[in-house]
């Protein structure tokens, strides 16, 4: 892990009770270093009904946010309040700095575009159809001319030279010559035209804060942390009938192995729930995992967490 990632603080924006990450670098960091996938929720304004490929922002579980806070690699910001406060108190220097950062991003986008265009042109250069070779000109051998034909050719040449001279005189008289041919014509100054961009974050305008609003403590947090610490990746499990879908590695590489539910230590679990969850897990080729943590007492803190897997063997 690089030193920049060691000092990295992920900004989690709390908006309307949801925990969102807008920076793509933060998204890559928490996925690569902390095994957190979460869910992309962004969509395109031109096509809001599409639900196949979603983009930024990334919405975190409350368990994700709490776990990152406990590891001291993130902070939670009250986004609406911070933006309103910063916009009201922004001075000229901060505003110029923000505009300069936007211009830098536009220049970077232009460089990336130019590089991609050059690579595309070089790639397709060899695929273009080669030009057909020009037919060679055959110079006829000199033939002896008769006196009459020689006189005719000489007259035609003299007439062409006279016409050319007359044309040169007419052109020179109608158009004045340039006094200084070595001086190139000056081109008008063109203002640098950069591509327009839409910033995905406002980090350049808002400084890194340390505000950490309270994160509601869910009962599923112990099981969630237990699985994450053992290298499992967790995604929503509604489509498989559980609270979580549990993967042995990155979901880009593996199928889910478990559908998981969290229960309280003393919570009564109906037998029908065990049967239906076990049968459902087996039907979708997964094991049903359930777990709970022993609560804290006066003599000890929150203790061990126990997890069990159930498979329906009669199908």
UniProtKB/Swiss-Prot annotation:
The gene is tsp-4. tRNA splicing endonuclease is a heterotetramer composed of tsp-2/sen2, tsp-1/sen15, tsp-4/sen34 and tsp-5/sen54. Interacts directly with tsp-1/sen15. This is Probable tRNA-splicing endonuclease subunit tsp-4. It catalyses: pretRNA = a 3'-half-tRNA molecule with a 5'-OH end + a 5'-half-tRNA molecule with a 2',3'-cyclic phosphate end + an intron with a 2',3'-cyclic phosphate and a 5'-hydroxyl terminus. One of its GO terms (biological process) is tRNA-type intron splice site recognition and cleavage. Constitutes one of the two catalytic subunit of the tRNA-splicing endonuclease complex, a complex responsible for identification and cleavage of the splice sites in pre-tRNA. It cleaves pre-tRNA at the 5'- and 3'-splice sites to release the intron. The products are an intron and two tRNA half-molecules bearing 2',3'-cyclic phosphate and 5'-OH termini. There are no conserved sequences at the splice sites, but the intron is invariably located at the same site in the gene, placing the splice sites an invariant distance from the constant structural features of the tRNA body. InterPro entries: tRNA_endonuc-like_dom_sf (IPR011856), tRNA_intron_Endo_cat-like_sf (IPR036167), tRNA_intron_Endonuc_cat-like (IPR006677), tRNA_splic_SEN34 (IPR016690). Residues 117-138, 169-188 are annotated as: Disordered. Residues 122-131 have a biased composition (Basic residues). GO terms for molecular function: lyase activity; nucleic acid binding; tRNA-intron endonuclease activity. One of its GO terms (cellular component) is tRNA-intron endonuclease complex. Keywords: Lyase, tRNA processing. Its EC number is 4.6.1.16. It is an enzyme of class 4 (lyase). Residues 170-184 have a biased composition (Polar residues). Belongs to the tRNA-intron endonuclease family.
